[in-house]
């Protein structure tokens, strides 16, 4: 194992220096991790919109939904939430979620925010858990949680606090299995949504004479081939026309084939998929796009994405998380007028199921939680908030008010999220270790999934990484199983 790590360290020394110098310290959504992220800022316009609570008739509609919740008295009404963002609207300016509305009204519950920062979140989690402070929940959509949070004793199984066979939990049973290790569930999953979407300006598509990507999707013709064809036809650097922008388009396109770098094994552990032929197909597709000039040349723009070029008509596609347009349009970075906003799922291979990288929303239950029952009931409120028609209607209205989305965009986002729920793909590289992630999903431009867009063919990269990564993942798998057995 020491020799393996020396080999990988040598590889990283050769490939990472330039990338780190050029790109800086980025989060998964392309943001800077060097600053304290405890306080979320919003525009005055957004805050003004969000000061409004439930509208006429919504109280009654919500009361009907709450009848589906367990009729119990919650002795401890406070759920302690450790995160780099608050769930309460008083500090964020965001409107109150339907799930939180129901938790407060049904159980008299409240969510106490224990603030941390993105960079210090795991150190603070360890301090809270080891100090016996009774922190209850941690963001479940953090891809670095599992399995290392189990191995380090930060998280516990949730099975003792929910009835997976109940009507409410059956709605998310498949999502629960995404974080099922050794036969135990480790997250209170509330919904599964798309990790990334493709954004485009409809006016640019029309001006080019292209078929609208959403219309192609509805006809079952939105796939790698049609995606590639549009890029080939549009890209012309001499005319300042660029193709595919985004910090994380590599991961989205990789996941769209259905196989992650590091995935679940049949026995509830983790395994390397680097030798999988489907993964190879995804990497070869990205290599082809790169060789044909489809990737946006960030190196010409101080290594930064330029999403505002979408609205200028000089960029065709931008793969990014939905958060990019979940704000007042005045703050959108894409520069697209709301009426011209186009969204569509990340395309998959021809004749493939439409796999999507999945964002698993919910809460990891902290070891030593003081209120696991409250955490589970809060999760149930959020499940119903995402599926009950009356609650969904309220959430839709909030999206239209808060983000100025049209009904068309609301409906399209639902359809994209439904795809992610039906065909979810989750990668566990970041959750295994920062070392494994740096060689597979989160490293420099010349490593792992980023190699193809840097001009390195997958066969060469696979030959370099396959055996060492397999050894590192096997070590994590053994430690995971030992930790589960010890619980």
Predicted regions and their residues:
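Extracytoplasmic/periplasmic solute-binding protein
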Residues: 80-82, 181-191, 196, 206, ...
